[in-house]
């Protein structure tokens, strides 16, 4: 669920708006839309020094504020329904966006997010950390990955729908029809443009696809991310100041960010950097995983995941196994759409015994002086992936 493709859309288009029609009043209004929250709950001293590369945690939150039953009943909780760790290389050639399965088990660090909550630490699922505030999610992701997080961006369900509607809808191509009454989702096969509500349902549906697990929908979320990147950076948006402003007004109203991204000028500076990355240099991939010992409904990071994170930490390109990045499927066939909107905390998620779901092609490393690296033993990494320039209707 998009949730997360917000990196290429929010940041790039913020730069376009500010540089193109950047009146002071416009900047002040858009900056005033943004909600801020601390980046971290603890001291900075135990974190690696910042380098020329950047790591941004994207959070799609399922705070239960929506009235529609199809998106889950309100229960006052707040969890990250989607998490993406986006790595921007120092050379400006690559963005590697790693999806982190929300049902990943790990030892969550103790956390006290001022104004949000505190947690004493312990074994738990990655997505539960957000219930104590974004800083606790940042701490949990750093614990899982060993990668420094420089910024975070959070968008909730209502914000996501507003963003898609402000874009004028999200063009997608579904190889197969989708019918999921639990998510109020009934979509035909083929090319179509989805409004915000259907795009969210598509991004969340579990029961209409695959084995009904949370893992099954990650490839579908890659499809939605790619579609958002393509639509938000299209001439239909960028060449129309009115549409661009509507999009950015909706987007900034939906954002919770750390103080380092709290102003349009901050987003514009980062957006200028993001806008120079070619679409073929943006790769979405799923964290390699395996079934958690003793709990097939949960997953843990695999040895290949450790290799992925090592490369992010030292800003090295990642070599992915297989043919070409693009279809985002678990078995090499094209994906059809995302998982559902029911309150799916993992009750019936059935993780496969080996979780690196699909083979994908080499991540683009154009312009990088480094040689793409694979796993710790030198083999290319096998996981689900697609490039941002994927033709969603191809094949």
Each language-model region and where it sits:
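Non-catalytic, solvent-exposed segments at the cell envelope interface
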Residues: 1-395
